């Protein structure tokens, strides 16, 4: 009953959930705006970056979901954007990531990113990721077009099949130069690839949030196996390549002494490729 208290609750809920609902109790939200922590950020290429994002919920359609964002950098004066449509063969209660997944997704993205942004567990535009231990000036304008199918089973096996076309244009302190006497500047790299990945985590359970789903218990072992093949001459792809990766995670408890989380990962790039297609460490220069 306190004046203005509902606005305090609204703001707190937006920051805790990281999304703003557009509905009411009587008319549940069909579109959520967010993540809130990506609306303002900063990086070497964009400078000040403003972004508006939104995603639909099962209140609009329990099978068909849309997600996207538009961002603008005030330093490079370029627009960045992403659009995604996902069809879930399972009826969802609120969001498509709810376990178990059985869906097909088409996405289109044009954005600026560093080579290691793909390893981040959070959104790369998270405002807290803007604070880094050193300047990250080696970045790329990346255009990705992807079609992905994901299937999860009750016994913990996840299968992912994906085809993707990527265009990588270096910018900032990053440049692609041929490794020969000519030292020719390469304006961009195009790849066309298909991948197959398996993830097996018996006994794993999740809690769903509006931004991601979080494992309830980290005691379940996780086994991963993936292979990606690149096709030269297909839809502009410039390189043949084969990348195989395997991984293992397991938590070990030592009574009252604590625990040890073990991560083991290995991979092989079987072809001669430019350095952006080589295996790289999962570096994160943010605090």
Please tell me what each predicted stretch does.
Residues 125-159:
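Outer-membrane beta-barrel signature, preferentially recognizing the C-terminal barrel domain
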Residues 40, 100-108, 113-121, 128-137, ...:
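C-terminal outer-membrane beta-barrel translocator/porin domains of Gram-negative envelope proteins
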Residues 47-51, 78-84, 99-103, 142-146, ...:
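Transmembrane beta-barrel architecture of outer membranes
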Residues 51, 65-67, 103-107, 158-162, ...:
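Residue-level detector of the transmembrane beta-barrel scaffold of outer-membrane proteins
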Residues 71, 75-78, 83-84, 102, ...:
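Outer-membrane beta-barrel domain signature
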Residues 1-73, 79-81, 87-96, 118-119, ...:
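Outer-membrane beta-barrel initiation region
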Residues 57, 69-73, 86-88, 107-111, ...:
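Outer-membrane beta-barrel pore domains and translocons
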Residues 61-63, 99-101, 154-156, 220, ...:
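Strand-connecting loop/turn motifs
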